[in-house]
């Protein structure tokens, strides 16, 4: 065999030695990957419910903090002198950590907490983004290098005014009462009612999966963490609404589910009864949740991204009933607060939004289009 032929077709021993070397290299790569992917390099920690509840006790919550009781989020705690000062609840999609809502904690420590979180995330190849962040943090985030886009407005119902916006619902309220519907409030839902409300929830979902980001879901421990209002007809549970604790002066509602064949007005019936409960508990206002894309990009001088959202709001009814959602809240709302999506400079708005949409779409029903699922959860 010539030397040239030997170089092209080496002996079996050479091939075997090469395979051994390749195998060792692959094992080394696997070991390196496992080391880099180990928990020592993960950002944040899993839910530690008592630690999280302590933060809410000391600093009160936000409009998103109740959702963060679900064990599907990661938590980054900023500390000083070994004491928790600020916590961020987030989920990861791609290279983004999507923080849900406002930071929770000491107001004086928010800025250094965000800065440290950004630095720690950057070391691990992540970028921070905030979803449904309130107006009071927009300027701070801009100074820290974030771009932002408005994604809608949250409606607030004042519970202290003499003329309540929901008084107009009294005729519907009385009609349903006369038809045998009655409301009961439980500070903690009795165990014996779990099966009944679970049945309502299953029928309301109609085969769809629960979402995993930015909303609550039917979960036993989650349901027992706050008050629940139940509506019955002839002793049968036909609907329920759950309390969403926020602060000493404000509360919202989370799950509002009724059986499919019940009157459409039953949702209003549950809301009106909840308002009465909140008044008795001393709350000053009720958070009615987000009206997606409401009052976004309405002028000719608005940012391009917000102009696109405005077009979707006006002509995207085949995706989601944006305008009817806004109008349904409008009957109760006394003021609106803007909510924003903030993402770091250097990020593509298109790709950051796509990653957010994919995250929101987790758990979607197969028969629903991806676009519809995304826009439902904006």
What are these regions (language model features)?
Residues 14-39, 353:
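Alpha-helical membrane-embedded segments
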Residues 32-99, 126, 131-148, 159-306, ...:
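A conserved beta-strand-loop-helix scaffold within acyl/acetyltransferase catalytic domains
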